[in-house]
């Protein structure tokens, strides 16, 4: 617990410009390893590892101590809420509050409701998110919610391209040229290859696309990415060591579309399924949650600007060349052009 408090102190010292303010903020943090404050809390956030059984076991110990009206929130990044809530005495109090790393810098929080979440719990979760100066994105319970659901095909496609012999640095360079803050290979290393593999397998099981199994040997060897110093790249002093992009071996001419349209097509699936309420929220969520090239307006705005018919035709061409994972989502048939709802 002390290392966490030390990090908080360093953060407050760096951000506070008012004398004494950092000490005041730090004093409001209470280390509570034994959970003695649970019975007084308005919001209790669970953030243990992604295992449904472990989460349910924790809830069984915590829920009896919650006061009336308190909400129980999970920081799950990919698990549906319904199985997590099934053994709760009051399943309607469970919500999802999915923060993104680094939490201090990422403004977005996915606020997830299940089929049984009570309106009061949903409203309280949204209000709490705003109160801590975050941007709440309402989502329906579904594997991966919005951001991870859209990101995973992008990162998996990058790994498939790498398996075909495309250099890692070339893959990242193509994404950065499009406008992404970093490439999918570097992003996977930062997220953690163990996390990518776990989430990717959950989404593959749910939706049938490929999983990023190519990284399994690295995970088994403890090469997890930035946090272990070695992953797809070697990491030194917090930075990826990338070989120079070789001009003599240019990227495949369809690589940009393979990466970006994988995201775009998945964003359409999220819209069609009603996981997020409208296209504008999806675009905002993907920009703030993943860093999708902001000047392009988000994946669905990008599709509108490029032309829905053009995007669908490119997806069909990619499906013919690379497989059914690129088959255009049925939602494109009712998706309008610029200015359409």
Language model: regions and residue ranges:
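N-terminal glycine-rich phosphate-binding loop for ADP-containing cofactors
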Residues: 1-341
